[in-house]
Amino acid sequence: MYSAVTQDIQITVLPEFIPERSNADQAMFFWAYTVEIANQSEKTVQLTARHWKITDGNGRLEEVQGPGVVGEQPILKPGETFRYTSGSNLTTPSGIMTGAYRMVDENGEEFDAQIPVFSLDSPFVRRVLN
């Protein structure tokens, strides 16, 4: 589990390799990840946009931006959480993801809540010890 806090917004990510949707012979590797966004502040906030940075095992970077998450722009009152599950596929057996959610508080102030860097690992990763 990976976690980061920005302005009292805690983002926790739990990635999971999905072998049923992966095929090493065809260089297709799929992960699901569950994200929990917890509003630990004293203000109501809304998630308005996402910006993901996905890097595969060869260092190739893909950026994904758009409104909200899974078709929603959730509003979180103080103490509330929002959880969703999504997925990502790579052509390499490992990679990393990170990014930020654009948040706006009840006063109209915008800020980026950091998504922690998290590792996408599969059983097909070849470990090398130096």
Swiss-Prot record:
Domain of life: Bacteria
Domain ApaG: 3-127
Transmembrane segments: none
A Gene Ontology biological process term: error-free translesion synthesis
Record-linked InterPro entries: ApaG_domain (IPR007474), ApaG_sf (IPR036767), Uncharacterised_ApaG (IPR023065)
Designated name of the protein: Protein ApaG
Taxonomic lineage of the native organism: Bacteria, Pseudomonadati, Pseudomonadota, Alphaproteobacteria, Hyphomicrobiales
Gene designation per UniProt: apaG
